[in-house]
């Protein structure tokens, strides 16, 4: 995968309210590969037990983009043909179960800004011009609204409140993790919907692992300032070359 050109998308959709929903929990940590109509995507088994939502993490398979964008590119800002990107959204939506005009896309700038999304935001950044910026997290309780965030190697965070029928998605790179955007998202859901953190179902999506994530000391200093010393040995280790290997997955688990 060309991480500079092909953008993967995290999709989470609030479906119609189902008032008799029961709480589900699972120890399942691995995503499953799904394929429909030639489109390949990933899902979480624990979320598939929830009739109130649909979700996916896209792959590069099943789209119409060509060359370095081949084939399921979902970014309008990388130089790909706009009509190809629109067709990719149509194909992904047909496979997963959403309409492109219901999608609300983030404008990720490594902040901890979390936006409350309403029905008036449908299509934002997808089928109509974007009306908000500097947004790395989104939450909603509006049925039919689709949240979309974008990734190369940063960490996708899913949030589902099956009690108050609400969802959230957040983009957590190292800056967002230091800023604890996961915690910010949960607090925002509590503020807006009355969500109880103990009742939330959360997940960490596909992203860079510790073995592949080398950082310099200035980044580690940020984590040392943000996290209690008792967690440091779980978050990073120093190598002989003076660099560090950083574990963003574990950092976000600690935040949750």
Predicted feature descriptions by range:
Residues 1-5:
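Methionine residue identity
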């Amino acid at each position: 995968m060309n991480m500079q050109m092909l953008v993967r998308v995290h999709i989470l959709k609030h479906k119609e309210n189902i008032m008799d929903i029961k709480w589900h929990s699972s120890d399942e940590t691995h995503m499953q590969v799904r394929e429909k109509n030639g489109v390949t995507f990933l899902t979480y088994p624990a979320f598939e037990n929830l009739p109130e939502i649909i979700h996916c993490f896209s792959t590069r398979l099943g789209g119409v983009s060509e060359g370095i964008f081949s084939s399921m590119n979902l970014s309008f800002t990388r130089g790909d043909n706009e009509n190809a990107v629109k067709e990719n959204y149509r194909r992904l939506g047909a496979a997963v179960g959403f309409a492109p005009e219901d999608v609300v896309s983030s404008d990720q700038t490594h902040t901890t800004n979390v936006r409350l999304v309403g029905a008036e935001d449908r299509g934002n950044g997808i089928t109509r011009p974007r009306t908000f910026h500097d947004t790395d997290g989104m939450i909603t309780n509006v049925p039919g609204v689709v949240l979309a965030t974008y990734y190369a190697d940063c960490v996708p965070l899913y949030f589902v409140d099956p009690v108050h029928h609400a969802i959230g998605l957040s983009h957590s790179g190292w800056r967002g993790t230091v800023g604890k955007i996961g915690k910010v998202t949960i607090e925002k859901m509590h503020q807006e919907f009355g969500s109880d953190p103990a009742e939330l179902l959360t997940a960490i999506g596909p992203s860079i692992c510790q073995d592949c994530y080398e950082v310099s000391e200035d980044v580690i200093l940020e984590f040392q300032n943000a996290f209690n010393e008792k967690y440091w040995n779980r978050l990073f280790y120093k190598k002989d070359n003076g660099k560090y290997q950083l574990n963003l997955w574990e950092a976000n688990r600690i935040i949750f």
